[in-house]
């Protein structure tokens, strides 16, 4: 899940610049996504997600088992591995953007909290994109137990990273 967990924090940290929606609004007068979703943030997030996946693959070659648990892989290597890593990273970013779109439709401003959705939007996007990239791999790796652990751990990790982002000045809100 590292390729899914890292893109959005790095997009926030190194983002900025031209918004993906180019400042355009919908018929309701609200921005499509808002200033928080930028091209630079998207591509930086994608790069860091991909690098995380590649580093994870390198570590798995040396340490396939951690604390007695066999760690998941991204397939047998080659292009399938690359596709899966990018699917997780891109899915994470699109999941976050998708929910930003709906938050704007609900009249919520950038940074406004939407509990549970804010913590899991990127995970759902990553899981959907991973499934679309390789349904067989997805079924092998993401058992009910694994998904349950992800859904429990992710909100805690999300809160912790947002608090850190708030204290270092990257985020305006600690959520």
From Swiss-Prot:
One Pfam family per UniProt: CarS-like
Give the GO cellular component terms, alphabetically.
Answer: plasma membrane
Catalytic EC class: transferase
Domain of life per record: Archaea
Compartments, as annotated in UniProt: Cell membrane
Task: Give the chief site where it resides.
Answer: membrane
Q: Name one GO molecular function term.
A: CDP-2,3-bis-(O-geranylgeranyl)-sn-glycerol synthase activity
An annotated GO BP: glycerophospholipid biosynthetic process
Q: Which pathway does UniProt place it in? A: Membrane lipid metabolism; glycerophospholipid metabolism
Q: What does this protein do?
A: Catalyzes the formation of CDP-2,3-bis-(O-geranylgeranyl)-sn-glycerol (CDP-archaeol) from 2,3-bis-(O-geranylgeranyl)-sn-glycerol 1-phosphate (DGGGP) and CTP. This reaction is the third ether-bond-formation step in the biosynthesis of archaeal membrane lipids.
Q: Which family does it belong to?
A: Belongs to the CDP-archaeol synthase family.
The identity of this protein, by name, is: CDP-archaeol synthase
